């Protein structure tokens, strides 16, 4: 069920089959949750045909949520369902609480996490932060939005992934490192930020990944990522159609920030939408308001 603070847990060679697991917060096929200052390691464990549902936050095929998490050689083919966008929060929560977040084929959410050589083939759905491997590492949205770091290596997803926003074939939203991983499932966001590998990241490094299926969003859709504000892409390939019903669609990224390096990437699929479309990137550049000093600096530079 839960790992207490300052406790180290290792789960190895365990499996759950043909069950139904329902809960409110941190619901997983193998482990529910790991609290702050806990460390969890799960290896060679599998969820087979078990349906996992969290009505509030963090549903995962292997683990619902863990503070510090290491997963190796695990798999899920059960159906994972996170909270719906219409789920109302309890009335006594602080104003800065986050809710209706996190659904993943392996992990719903985490603090610092590393997920290696794991795969998902089950359908994953939720509201915000939905991914084939991990859903969301969102920490807070007030006064600013912050994420924890996750690394995904040698992983794959073949299940369909859908939700409202921040939807990805491997990761919904996080500060992400991804290496030698791929997605074969259809990715769909009812609202914004959908990507074959990643929905959204303020910072990401994605190398040697591939997307093979369709990516659809109302806005911000990309064959690899819906949006990345800063980071690098190298040796990535998209072969899935990318569509935005409104704006920002690209073979690699729907919209990128001011600081991005991209090398040896390729797109072989059609891009469609109403505005800001690109074979590689829909648009590059952060939105900003020009101050008087910015104008003066530009004048002197000119």
Language-model segments: residues:
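Predominantly extracellular beta-rich ligand-binding scaffolds that present long acidic/polar faces
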Residues: 1-302
